[in-house]
Amino acid sequence: MLIAAYLAYLPSVLLLIFTRSFSGIALTMLSIGFAAGIFKPLVFGTVRATTDQTNSTLGFGIFYAMVNVGGSLGPVIAGRLRAISWNYAFYAAAAAIGLMLVITLLFYREPARELERKRLGEKLAEIREALSDLRFAGFLLLIGVVFWIPFWAFFNLCALYVDRSLDTAALYELLRGVLGAGVAGFLSHDEGGARRILGETISHTGYIIMIVQIAVSRVVERFRPIPAFATGLCVAALGFVVLGAAATGRVGLVFLGIFLFAVGEMIASPRIQEYITRLAPKEKAGLYTGTNFLAVGVGAFSGVLYTPLYGRFADAGHPGWVWYVLAGHLVAGLLVLALYQRLAGTMAEQAE
């Protein structure tokens, strides 16, 4: 199935080179989403099948760190290549997919498990069974609203915020003073004779996560899932507040805000996804992970909610205010989550 996912990914990415109409791009992106829908639950299920209660938090942390190697390098490489031609960025993505296919063929080994002899209808019945648990379905919806909407809002808005609302020439000088002209030059471009930081090269968390995720997971594994998740949301909310303050003239705060959001993400995201996966028996881990992506999908509404809101605040001369609203969203969500846990109870993880 991993091979099937790659074979679905590859032509979809290459089609972006030739597609020009809105409908064509939309259909191509749906095809990429279909490939991701195959790929991601398989990987989560593999991690679940090869870990137990003693090492699952670390296992999911390692997986999350590896995901963010791509999350770190991808925006930097794409940012450099799209400055030359968008086609080069798509060629690089296709090459990475081809490399994943080769690595899978050479190194991936199927985890030991009992083979299921179930027909498609029986599998669909299991999905209905999982979602018919109103407490579980309500929890997924709540996680989508409380966490995934602000999460995706960060990635939708941060590069735009940096490029349009901050002094990117001053950001270049700050980076040059700390990391040197070589690194700062790689993360910037020339615009009218001045070096300016490209928003997409710094407005992500992957480079932070791939360095410190495992250490964070080691600390977080000592705590129960929901309190750990709530702590992550609090740290992310603080990051949003700092990001908003960067628009007041202290542009260097954008780096601190991104770092704090990354720490919150490292605490909250792998922990809550591990928790949802461990609500199911090992043989149904992929199924429950698939339902988890329904919560992730709720985050798509961040574009509808927060991108127009940013535009309104920016037009009014207060672009940083959108981050304060996002911080309030997380804090209010924590209160709703606590109320839900009190009324519906905490769902128990499956024993090994």
Residue ranges and their predicted role:
Residues 1, 82, 211-225:
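Helix-to-loop junctions at the C-terminal end of transmembrane segments
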Residues 80-95, 308-331:
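A membrane-interface helix-boundary motif in multi-pass transporters
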Residues 99-111, 324-352:
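Multi-pass alpha-helical transporter architecture, strongest
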Residues 113-142, 174-175, 183-186:
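Juxtamembrane intracellular "pre-TM" segments in multi-pass secondary transporters
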Residues 38-51, 266-281:
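Intracellular juxtamembrane helix-capping segments at the cytosolic ends
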Residues 1-15, 23, 227-242:
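Structural signature of the two symmetry-related core transmembrane helices
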Residues 18-23, 245-249:
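Helix-breaking motifs and short loop linkers at transmembrane-helix boundaries and internal kinks
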Residues 57-76, 82, 97, 290-306:
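Glycine-rich segments within core transmembrane alpha-helices of 12-TM secondary carriers
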